[in-house]
């Protein structure tokens, strides 16, 4: 059985091809989803990839969350479908209310593009089951608005419920509160992170193949469901 993973393309999306390739490398079938699609074509999971959807006008992800396809993604996520938001996709998921908090301008007010070490904090999500808790992975980070912020109550809730999925190791590149690089929904089916695992799937072209574990994980989750 091959799981079908939808990869959304908005105007301004940059990383849909890389996300689709990561799905294929993990053994899944990547299905293209257009922002105007009124259905999800029977996919088992969805990836909202990185880029600059709608030119980042208003706020990053603020317009994309109103795209027809996102209405279907929200419904599917509420029904338990695994959804991953990467970089701009993380911003979209926050705007859509699937994840708490917001991503704001980096603390240094500059675009960051470099490889970053992340610590895997939670392995019970649909997207991280292949990792060991406490493992450190190397993946690229490229964003200008990647600073995760939320109220202290929300941050305490995320920490207390084990929903901080990834944390930056060493220095905090963008000033994210508590060094948070990625979080999950309460049921662990929806995950958002700012760094790019899809760019770390082949050692030849990336800093590592550490990101591939996320795509293996969701295929495991879908097949075992």
From Swiss-Prot:
Pathway where this protein functions: Purine metabolism; IMP biosynthesis via de novo pathway; 5-amino-1-(5-phospho-D-ribosyl)imidazole from N(2)-formyl-N(1)-(5-phospho-D-ribosyl)glycinamide: step 1/2
Catalytic reactions of this protein: N(2)-formyl-N(1)-(5-phospho-beta-D-ribosyl)glycinamide + L-glutamine + ATP + H2O = 2-formamido-N(1)-(5-O-phospho-beta-D-ribosyl)acetamidine + L-glutamate + ADP + phosphate + H(+); L-glutamine + H2O = L-glutamate + NH4(+)
Keyword set, alphabetical order: ATP-binding, Cytoplasm, Glutamine amidotransferase, Hydrolase, Ligase, Nucleotide-binding, Purine biosynthesis
Top-rank taxon: Bacteria
One GO CC annotation: cytoplasm
Positions of the catalytic residues: 87, 196, 198
Localization annotation: Cytoplasm
Protein name in UniProt: Phosphoribosylformylglycinamidine synthase subunit PurQ
Protein species of origin: Rhodococcus jostii (strain RHA1)
Encoding gene (name): purQ
């Amino acid at each position: 059985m091959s799981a079908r993973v939808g990869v959304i393309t908005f105007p301004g999306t940059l990383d849909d091809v890389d996300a689709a390739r990561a799905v294929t490398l993990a053994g899944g079938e990547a299905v293209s989803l257009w922002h105007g699609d009124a259905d999800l074509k029977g996919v088992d999971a969805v990836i909202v990839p990185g880029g600059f959807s709608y030119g980042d006008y208003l706020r990053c992800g603020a317009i994309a969350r109103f795209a027809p396809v996102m209405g279907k993604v929200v419904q599917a996520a509420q029904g338990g479908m695994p959804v991953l938001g990467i970089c701009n996709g993380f911003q979209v998921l926050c705007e859509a209310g699937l994840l708490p908090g917001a991503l704001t301008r980096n603390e240094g007010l500059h675009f960051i593009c470099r490889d970053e070490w992340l610590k895997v904090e939670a392995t019970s999500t649909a997207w991280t089951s292949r990792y060991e808790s406490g493992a450190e992975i190397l993946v690229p980070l490229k964003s200008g608005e990647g600073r995760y912020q939320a109220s202290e109550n929300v941050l305490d809730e995320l920490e207390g419920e084990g929903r901080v999925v990834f944390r930056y190791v060493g220095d905090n590149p963008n000033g994210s509160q508590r060094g948070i690089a990625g979080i999950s929904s309460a049921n662990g089916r929806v995950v958002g992170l700012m760094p790019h695992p899809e760019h770390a799937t082949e050692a030849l072209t990336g800093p590592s193949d550490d990101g591939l574990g996320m795509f293996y994980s969701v295929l495991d989750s879908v097949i075992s469901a």
